[in-house]
Amino acid sequence: MSISPGGLATGIGSLPHLDAAAAVDLVRRYCPAIPHWPQLPRANKREYFTYQNLQLLLDLGLLQIEGDRHALFDCDAPEWPERVAEFYGIYLEAAEGSQQALDRLAFSPGAADGWDRFCDDLAARGYGGARFLKGQVAGLLTAGFEITDPGGRPAYYNPQLRDVLLKQLSLQAAWQARSLGRFGLPALIFMDDPVIYSCGMSDRIGVSREEVLTELNEFASFVRSAGGLVGVHSCADLDWSLLLEAELDIISFDAYQFASSFVLFPELIRSFLERGGVVAWGLIPTFHGGGEALAGENLASLQGRTGRLLQELERRAVDLRLLQSQSLVTPACGTAILSEPEAVRVYELTAGLATAWNSLFTG
């Protein structure tokens, strides 16, 4: 299924709020067409991605937590082979359509208060004029370089551990897609993976472009099988051809900082748009310059920046009609590191630029 959102506003995921109700109210006020459930990492350590996205691996004993956050695969445990086999059994059952198996991926109590409040709010108030609902999971490379084996080596470098992480994140994303789909709207599920920038870097020689592309496509295929549309978000600069060539529905990136490198791939951008892809333009700064960039911008200045970006894309023979219809307007990244007033301003500017989107293509 392809979509034409026409510059609608949504967010990336995280907010600085401690109160889930206030966070949901903010999202629904400024992103009414594509509300997302808010991640609240400041509110509770269990909102950290290890607990939020990898709870099944903890439940099965595949992962252990050291201290508050450091997670490692317990590969040396005598029960490791049986635990891995149990995990793959759950994955295969879910892949064959078992809702009971997929429900093993439900967030544990306290791990996603924003999700709980978001879904309760949708059930109580309805979804108003929403056209889509959005969820998000951690990225494979981000998780794979933070989680280690017992010797401290990043899990991503171990093919078995990497595959377990990929399938776990695919399951979690599919569970979100299926759960949001029950409200009767299409679900957009983003994999948030800033560490994907490391693909092809000399100090990450174990990160193969071909393997990353294959993994992205496997993730996308699995989530689509649960009824979701699939995006990847990165707030770091990278070789954008990787995402443009992947089988994704949406590419989300920090356009405030990195539009100049993204536009260097006009042929791939054209091809991506022509096959129905959507670009989520992160046009509102979130942390660039330690907050100074946000303080120095207003709606008029952001419209000017966006207009110049569109002119550059047109100069490179990218079809503006496709850009107009197949775009989203978002913050550059999540807003958890900002203050609550700064986060509100980011969302205000996002909504304002989305409202002005179509006017940028006239005159």
Language-model features, listed with the residues they occupy:
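Alpha/beta catalytic barrel-like cores
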Residues: 1-157, 277, 312, 325, ...
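A cross-family glycoside hydrolase active-site/sugar-binding cleft signature
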Residues: 37-40, 134-138, 190-192, 231-235, ...
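Short acidic/His/Gly/Ser-rich catalytic and metal-binding motifs that mark active-site loops
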Residues: 142-147, 197-201, 290
